[in-house]
Amino acid sequence: MRFNRIVFTMLLTSWFLVGCGTDKLETLTKAEGVKPDNAANASGNASSGGTNNGEAAVTYNRKSRTADVMADPVFGDYGRLLFPVQRGYWSGETLEQLRLTYYNYIDPDETVAIVNYLHNQASDEQTVFYDIYSDDEKTADPRKQDTGLFFFRGNRGSRFAVCNAGGAFAYVGAMHDSFPHALELSKKGYNAFALIYRPGALTACEDLARAISFIFAHADELGVNTDCYSLWGGSAGGRMAAWVSGYGTAAFGGDNLPKAGTAVIQYTGLSEYSLDDVPTYACVGSGDGIAYWRTMKARLDGLSSLGIPTEFHVYEGLPHGFGLGTGTVADGWIDDAVRFWERQMKDNNTTGIKPITK
């Protein structure tokens, strides 16, 4: 019953962009930490990167052309997926000029750091991109050619996260809404993947379920711990994280796998919840004109009433799509989110923790 409702909701969501909003309100649950090293290869498209988290020689700068980045031979066929394949939703001849529809506070220095990290890793002969579909599957559905996982390595044997960018289910704004998160998580020692998926609510969730199945199947080669993994997402990506963590991967055509230990959700106005949902951290800005913060808070309050751990932050005045929020009142929220995730690791997802409103 609930799954049938979600499929219907997904179809509606394909027509509307939904986000979140705020005031200076927080709900807290605590946590703990880690550091980075490297992992091995799994089957899939490859290129490389080491354990330096972007500290190798700088190749690109703010004035570098996006076209040159995408065409860099070190990235092979997947360089085109660094920026949205749907051209109508972004612009910018250079890295510092990057603009993405629905997004704010795009940090050009972060963009430069990401492309240099991936370039340095690839030059170091570390695999930074994995296909999640076979050639036959791509032939049967050509849209699957525009999917895959970018891998930001942490410590070998550490837990993993899958980060899902938003884009109204019309495009994937990874350079601002998932790559930065994945890079920060890798710096903290966690293995982070950023998913490039097919636009569309249902196909996006199918791709996420397939990606998680791929990671589980290749966990030893990737060097990841599959216990209490987390799903992250902003806007449309936040819905993906909520739906797949709540319904499970099998509901979207993936393998029958354990649910995520934590969902980290930014600016998406999803309202439904149930006992099937997982511990959830959420944040949003009070100036968000796409997703209403009270809708988001009501969902977190509902989860908390069911004994599901939650943490909720509303940042005064921030609009939709602030990403990491560097230089804003939300700066550092990702540290709170990681601590929340770590708390779930410690509590083994069994302790109901009441939110604290500040």
Predicted regions and their residues:
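N-terminal targeting or regulatory segments adjacent to alpha/beta-hydrolase or S9 domains
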Residues: 19-146, 355-358
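C-terminal catalytic histidine-bearing segment of alpha/beta-hydrolase fold enzymes
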Residues: 44, 49-64, 306-358
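A short loop-to-beta-strand scaffold at the N-terminal edge of the catalytic core in hydrolase folds
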Residues: 141-153, 159-160
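Short beta-strand element of the alpha/beta-hydrolase
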Residues: 158-167
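Short amphipathic alpha-helix adjacent to the substrate-entry channel of hydrolases
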Residues: 175-193
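Primarily recognizes the serine-hydrolase "nucleophile elbow" in alpha/beta-hydrolase
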Residues: 206, 210-277
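Short beta-strand/loop motif that positions the catalytic acidic residue
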Residues: 282-284
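Conserved alpha/beta-hydrolase "acid-adjacent" motif
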Residues: 289-295
